[in-house]
Amino acid sequence: MGGGGEDEYESLPTHSVPVHLTAGALAGAVEHCVMFPFDSVKTRMQSLCPCPETKCPTPVHSLMSIVKREGWLRPLRGVNAVAAGSMPAHALYFTVYEKMKGYLTGNSAGHSNTLAYGASGVVATLIHDAIMNPAEVVKQRMQMAFSPYGSSLECARCVYNREGVAAFYRSYTTQLAMNVPFQAIHFMSYEFWQHVLNPEHKYDPKSHLIAGGLAGGLAAALTTPMDCVKTVLNTQQAAEADPANRRIFLQARYRYRGISDAVRTIYSQRGLSGFSCGLQARVIFQVPATALSWSVYELFKFMLSFEGGHSS
């Protein structure tokens, strides 16, 4: 491989928007879909709706419980909603991050730029969450035990008809309160580990995989409390009996007005431990998901820049 391809890879943050859009979209789909079953486990463990999985000792036991009771495909309910939302959201997310990082650092790398990496991640998150929040609402309602919706489209239509557009953004401020620190920690950690493992900042699959996994796991663990609050706001449903069919189903109930209501309810029902529900499942989901996301992003960024270099 000639030096030209490497030079183009290093210069990407300053000008190659189409590359970042394409690589980011592919990375988003991989990140959210590959480990999706554990995201379903996390949602059920964090929600205050009735769910047998809250009594399981580990996320793996919870996943097997869902499969045993509801079938192999049940943990994948809602994956199409998150895939549809994550591709445009991540395309803009990575593009904005790279452009902001290049602007704030002058396209230089190093520990001295840690705050610039964090600030770039925050700006990217504001745009990402505005696109992703409606998909997150649909996804989490589809993931719930006893969810009455047959498809993600049906879920979106029912939420809109019963609760209005506001329902899709009820948890937006909470999502930002979680994702702003998450992404700041995530990007600062990723760039830190890249500087340690890959000081020349060349394309290096192993360093991207390791740095991505470590960064995602740390950020996920530290922001789990706000993730619990977000899940409670997104899954405001109550269990009701259906005597005719001898089953339980979930009916939408708008009970929590915002972050403070959700925090008080979680604490009153579960105590302080309620804010760490789903931590293991969240980390299990996030470590490989973030590792794969960065690996795919860096791979396609490199491939697309290399192709561009040869075609010019």
Swiss-Prot record:
Membrane topology reported for the UniProt record: Multi-pass membrane protein
Major site of localization recorded for this protein: mitochondrion
GO BP: iron import into the mitochondrion
S-S bridge residues: none
Entry keyword set: Ion transport, Iron, Iron transport, Membrane, Mitochondrion, Mitochondrion inner membrane, Repeat, Transmembrane, Transmembrane helix, Transport
Subcellular location: Mitochondrion inner membrane
Knockout-associated phenotype: RNAi-mediated knockdown results in smaller, but normally-proportioned animals that are paler and thinner as compared to wild-type, a reduced growth rate, slow movements with a 35% decrease in the number of body bends per 20 seconds, reduced brood size, increased lifespan and inceased sensitivity to the oxidative stress inducer paraquat. RNAi-mediated knockdown results in increased lifespan.
GO MF entry, a single one: ferrous iron transmembrane transporter activity
Annotated Solcar repeat ranges: 15-103, 112-196, 203-303
InterPro entries: Mitochondrial_sb/sol_carrier, Mt_carrier_dom_sf
Family the UniProt entry places it in: Belongs to the mitochondrial carrier (TC 2.A.29) family.
Functional description taken from the UniProt entry: Mitochondrial iron transporter that mediates iron uptake. Probably required for heme synthesis of hemoproteins and Fe-S cluster assembly.
Protein name: Mitoferrin
Gene name linked to the record: mfn-1
